[in-house]
Amino acid sequence: MVDVSSIAPDAMSKDESIEKEHTWRILGYGNPGTGKTHFGFTMPKPVFCIDTEGKAHSITEKFDGDIYIFEVDNYDEAETALSQALDGLEAYRNEENQIGTLMVDSMSNMWDWAQQKYVELDNPGKSPHEVNFSSALGSGQSDWQIIKRLHNQRFRERMLDTEFNLYWTGTSSEDYGAILEGQDDPPAKPDGEKNNIYKSTEVLHFY
């Protein structure tokens, strides 16, 4: 029998791969009331939930294990909650040897809030619907580049850079590209930053 460990010491065997703990990166999207939040609380505990909708607390009594909820109302509060949630998950890993879950309910709202955060910086008192995001700033960066930095680098990438389980929810919308192409029954897609779906290893559509 070939002693692969002596030839390729960095290679993982089948048995080792089976024993290795799987880390989940899940995006669950759908209409309200389809069970997206419910599913999140079944993820590996502890679950630290950043709740942008103010509803998650109403179903926690149904679940066992440690669940912590941050009820947030804007981008800044969500960013602070993210830092605290990561600290909490790190403490559980170090002290209890538990790899928990970071849940954001929902990432659709985070995309809206990143836009609102940018508007507050450049156009105080206005909403994103009142601002044209097509102009370039003096630095040469477009409005959308700044918004994506708020959402992607300052928020999403911080989660993706961890070894914890991730669960994001999103609302459902029609694929307008498919509509423009003339499809009679266009597929649904998750609302929010368009690359969220590609940053997930599993995508669940809740009906």
Where are these regions (language model features)?
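Conserved P-loop
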Residues: 7-8, 16-104, 108-113
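Glycine-rich, phosphate-binding/catalytic loops in enzymes
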Residues: 45, 66, 118-122, 184-185
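Phosphate-binding/switch loop-helix module in NTP-utilizing enzymes
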Residues: 74-163
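N-terminal donor/sugar-recognition subdomains of glycan-related enzymes
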Residues: 12
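Short, flexible loop segments at the rims of nucleotide/cofactor-binding pockets, characterized by
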Residues: 25-28, 144-146, 182-183
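Phosphate-binding/switch region of NTP-binding enzymes
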Residues: 158-207
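Amphipathic coiled-coil/heptad-repeat helices and related helical stalk/stem segments
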Residues: 33, 151-152, 189
